[in-house]
Amino acid sequence: MSGLFGPLSRPGPLPSAWLFLLLLGPSSVLGISFHLPVNSRKCLREEIHKDLLVTGAYEITDQSGGAGGLRTHLKITDSAGHILYAKEDATKGKFAFTTEDYDMFEVCFESKGTGRIPDQLVILDMKHGVEAKNYEEIAKVEKLKPLEVELRRLEDLSESIVNDFAYMKKREEEMRDTNESTNTRVLYFSIFSMFCLIGLATWQVFYLRRFFKAKKLIE
């Protein structure tokens, strides 16, 4: 049997670099489903790097048949409380935004209704970074071949991994600087405490000596 580029051979072990890319590739995808009881609120949090495209799709299955005026609100915010996406009476839809800084983002679903209403089923699919890009659309616009599209995807993925390592290195340096600063402060505080104890002990010696002299217990 032959393939596009010649005879097909038995697949060998993947190079470690490619295997590393394949293992890290799905890490930017969040797919989850859960049940949301009436008059409850559930939130999901995720840390995302700066300047990344975030896309998502959600679907909320209403099993109440419209009873009890059941409404579900969706809101996405950053750590500062800025609203990036909001939808009242959400049932099904998509959202997209670009992060401005490395931050913790929160996706919240809140259900409101009255009476005994079955739990809603919430399905959420979030992607960011390489996985959020529509490479089919890129291929159409730039007229790329399938192999070129895959190479573009691997290039973006490797760049994303390099950026992750650079960020982790930066965080490590910041934590090391913080640790060194803390150690220096602890050292200074220890020296200050030692001088305070020495001063207090000296004062006690002179005070007791004066007291004993006043009582004529010592000369």
Curated annotation (Swiss-Prot):
Residues 1-31 form the signal peptide. The modification Dimethylated arginine is found at residues 171, 176. Residues 147-178 are annotated as: Required for TMED10 and TMED2 cis-Golgi network localization. It is a single-pass type I membrane protein. The chain crosses the membrane at residues 186-206. A motif (COPI vesicle coat-binding) lies at residues 211-219. Residues 1-142 are annotated as: Required for interaction with STX17. GO terms for biological process: COPI-coated vesicle budding; cytosol to ERGIC protein transport; Golgi organization; intracellular protein transport; positive regulation of interleukin-1 production; positive regulation of protein secretion; protein localization to ERGIC; regulated exocytosis. Residues 204-219 are annotated as: Interaction with COPG1. Residues 41-193 form the GOLD domain. The GOLD domain is required for proper p24 heterooligomeric complex formation and efficient transport of GPI-anchored proteins. The lumenal domain mediates localization to the plasma membrane by partially overriding the ER retention by the cytoplasmic domain. This is Transmembrane emp24 domain-containing protein 10. It comes from Mus musculus (Mouse).
